[in-house]
């Protein structure tokens, strides 16, 4: 779970018997501490590892990447999804969503909506990933990398 925030998706996945282990990656130490506290309260702390960066996980390939409500906050979201592609194998799935919009009255001031950045993101997405059906979360899109 990249940019996992308060841990909603990481904890839900950790509670699933179908999930072996979850890596919660967030640059914010307060978030990591809070989710670790929640994991202990829920009894799933052994199924989670808390990291500041993807590199800190020391995992070369992931089965699933969850990145929700994060890409629109990055200066170069295209580079990030290229990085994700590099840590996926041919059967991996990435769950993404985004909202590249600052709002009509700057309601979302921390969102990226520069047209060149957004266009580069979509070009990168479409040339590196294939959208696939998934029953996991209807507000996201699931992608596998193009071989």
Where are the language model's segments positioned?
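Conserved SAM-binding loop of SAM-dependent methyltransferases across substrates and taxa
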Residues: 6-18
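Conserved Class I S-adenosyl-L-methionine
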Residues: 108-133
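Class I SAM-dependent methyltransferase SAM/SAH-binding core
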Residues: 21-45
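Conserved SAM-binding strand-loop segment of SAM-dependent methyltransferases
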Residues: 44-54
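Conserved beta-strand signature within the Rossmann-like core of class I S-adenosyl-L-methionine
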Residues: 91-99
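A short glycine-rich, Lys/Arg-flanked "PGG" loop and its adjoining helix->strand segment in the class I
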Residues: 79-90
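Conserved beta-strand/loop positions that form the S-adenosyl-L-methionine
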Residues: 2
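A conserved beta-strand element that flanks and buttresses the S-adenosyl-L-methionine
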Residues: 66
